[in-house]
Amino acid sequence: MSSKTVARSGTRTSRSKATSRGASRSARSAVPRKRSRPVKGVGRPSRRHHRSLLVSTGLACGRAMRAVWMMAAKGTGGAARSIGRARDIEPGHRRDGIALVLLGLAVVVAASSWFDAARPLGAWVDALLRTFIGSAVVMLPLVAAAVAVVLMRTSPNPDSRPRLILGASLIGLSFLGLCHLWAGSPEAPESRLRAAGFIGFAIGGPLSDGLTAWIAAPLLFIGALFGLLLLAGITIREVPDAMRAMFGTRLLPREYADDFEDFADFDGDDADTVEVARQDFSDGYYDEVPLCSDDGPPAWPSAEVPQDDTATIPEASAGRGSGRRGRRKDTQVLDRIVEGPYTLPSLDLLISGDPPKKRSAANTHMAGAIGEVLTQFKVDAAVTGCTRGPTVTRYEVELGPGVKVEKITALQRNIAYAVATESVRMLAPIPGKSAVGIEVPNTDREMVRLADVLTARETRRDHHPLVIGLGKDIEGDFISANLAKMPHLLVAGSTGSGKSSFVNSMLVSLLTRATPEEVRMILIDPKMVELTPYEGIPHLITPIITQPKKAAAALAWLVDEMEQRYQDMQASRVRHIDDFNDKVRSGAITAPLGSQREYRPYPYVVAIVDELADLMMTAPRDVEDAIVRITQKARAAGIHLVLATQRPSVDVVTGLIKTNVPSRLAFATSSLTDSRVILDQAGAEKLIGMGDGLFLPMGASKPLRLQGAYVSDEEIHAVVTACKEQAEPEYTEGVTTAKPTAERTDVDPDIGDDMDVFLQAVELVVSSQFGSTSMLQRKLRVGFAKAGRLMDLMETRGIVGPSEGSKAREVLVKPDELAGTLAAIRGDGGE
């Protein structure tokens, strides 16, 4: 303890000594500061003040020079970064800039070499160029101007760029070598200036020295010829055909044979009619049509929509000459002709769309971003091409040897992050290609007009009245479909996805292609406002139905119509309604003797339900049973259903409905579950809305992505007005009338010992006009189960409507009909 105390005291002593020494130093240092305080009138402080002023001035100048230097450095760096970002300029602007630079150089070179007018800089440029290419400098302005014009008048084609550069280089080098040989192969520098310069000497000199000029000249000529073939993009074997096509010497029958390859037995001279290939739904009535004269005006507007509207990185493979031949065939496509006084509305009433957009700098940036993601995750794959569609661009990724497809699909979220979008959809693989497709939305979407779809070549070639325009796919092809081949369609999509626009496009397509004698419609619109513009069109069987109960009755009437058609086809021994109509027109079949009926061709019937969910909530059993019966066997009878819904849940789109409706069209859905309900697979939840959809026709394994066609309210009004001006609707009686109650027994009608209680319940409900189970419990003093059974018995006899959840049931019997209803019930009970 004593040692510790001594150590502590020693430590305190040393600290105190150090403190005293520090204090003495501070005291000594404080004394001189007091002595060095400046005194007025003494010269020594003034010299120090003069030196401090010089130092301050120097420091200020240094700071100013540093600021100027930093500003210059920042300006230079900003300019360099701006120049580096020049690659983000649109390809068209970049090509125009290069072309204008070439024109400027052509002017300078022409002034210096032709007129000796651009001194002193022009003399230096002329001397430099003559050193390299000699007297060929006089042709350089013409070549530069020609290249500039080509750049300004053509679109970029990255695939052909190496071929063009190599071809131009071969032509230029061979020409300089020939010029050197023509000038006598001079070796002196002064003589080379008047020949082909240093380049001509380097090309032609070794050839002439080693092989003589007589052999060198043909070799150089062959090199120039090969360069010319590269520029033209043809081979030697194709030269004769190219010359014939250039000078118009191709034989006309061969050209027409190419143009009319889809028609049968056409000789190009004296054919007045052509017969379109019979489809499986055709009855021969729409097959034979007169051939339009070549001199006559086209039936549709002459505005052509380019077919080749895709751009790729590099461009996706396409048939050569497809655009030229496609345009030539469009002029020969025959339009549909109908019989009778009714005239189809002209497609001039519809608005044509803008030309398709080409590849932009954004597509190049997206391809680079996808490639960087693959590189960062060390996946042996590369972006080999892209195809731009109206809504999305599909980038094709080819995998290296031994790379699993799952490595690409697992990077979906990383690729979405790289391209700064959520709606990235992968297609592994692309149908018909050994590549994985990555679909990325375009920042500049294009609108697909219904007029362009209906005037497309493939749509006009199909003369069936049930052909509807769908839209345009990623490849840039217009997509149409035949309802007779579907034969029923299920459409689903959330709010704003484009479902209502599709229904409008489908109806306008039918109105512009079919007469009321060919197609009749039943429009069911529980939302009351979607199909209002079509009220009064002559194609309607009954006025537009807005009440769910009447809709269920209309579907039941459609079942009866289907059964009647099958009975007629059975009696006529035909299997399809088209065959029946064909025989009726030809007089091959007539009504049986003694019958009051008269056989007439049956029109196609298209029933469109705009919101299936409302019907399924009101009368699920009746609606589902009718839909299932129609979809199971109505195809041969010419009856087709189009079911649309915003809520594709399992209680709306039931298993029986899905099984019997093979064709599906899904727009953007709110969840993966909805996508699987409508398509039986994922994908619809990745769509971006506004007409972006997936079409899964009957028999297809993978859906086709397309942009739905758009038709405006003004176009709808114009087409509907044109239809109303020609005919009035002829409504059929009894379509929305419900069947007698005796036929609508879904619950066991045996009342048993509860007759008195049941009569009291009926009297109570009818007199109060309030169908509530809880009211029966209170008034009759029965349990919930018995009150519910009484309500079900009243529903089977048509006294109350179906259950609507927690709401009271609708009472269908009026108080003044109570006596007759009670008498009918007593009669039932007595049986």
UniProtKB/Swiss-Prot annotation:
Q: Does the keyword Cytoplasm apply?
A: no
Q: Mind listing the UniProt keywords for this protein, alphabetically? A: ATP-binding, Cell cycle, Cell division, Cell membrane, Chromosome partition, DNA-binding, Membrane, Nucleotide-binding, Transmembrane, Transmembrane helix
Q: Name one GO molecular function term.
A: ATP binding
* Subcellular compartments: Cell membrane
Task: Please give the Pfam families that the UniProt record associates with this protein.
Answer: FtsK_4TM, FtsK_alpha, FtsK_gamma, FtsK_SpoIIIE
Annotated membrane topology:
Multi-pass membrane protein
Cellular component GO terms, alphabetical: cytosol; peptidoglycan-based cell wall; plasma membrane
- Tell me the Gene Ontology biological-process terms attached to this UniProt entry: cell division; chromosome segregation
The UniProt entry, under InterPro entries, shows: FtsK/SpoIIIE/SftA, FtsK_4TM, FtsK_alpha, FtsK_dom, Ftsk_gamma, P-loop_NTPase, WH-like_DNA-bd_sf, WH_DNA-bd_sf
Chief subcellular location: membrane
Q: Which PROSITE patterns match?
A: FTSK
Q: Where is this region: Disordered?
A: 1-48, 296-331
* Signal sequence annotation: none
The FtsK domain extends over: 476-676
Q: Which residues bind ATP?
A: G496, S497, G498, K499, S500, S501
The protein's job, in short, is: Essential cell division protein that coordinates cell division and chromosome segregation. The N-terminus is involved in assembly of the cell-division machinery. The C-terminus functions as a DNA motor that moves dsDNA in an ATP-dependent manner towards the dif recombination site, which is located within the replication terminus region. Required for activation of the Xer recombinase, allowing activation of chromosome unlinking by recombination.
Domain notes per entry: Consists of an N-terminal domain, which is sufficient for the localization to the septal ring and is required for cell division, followed by a linker domain, and a C-terminal domain, which forms the translocation motor involved in chromosome segregation. The C-terminal domain can be further subdivided into alpha, beta and gamma subdomains. The alpha and beta subdomains form the DNA pump, and the gamma subdomain is a regulatory subdomain.
Q: Which additional comment does the entry carry?
A: Was identified as a high-confidence drug target.
* Family that this chain belongs to: Belongs to the FtsK/SpoIIIE/SftA family.
Assembly and partners?
Answer: Homohexamer. Forms a ring that surrounds DNA.
Return the protein name. DNA translocase FtsK
Q: Which gene encodes it?
A: ftsK
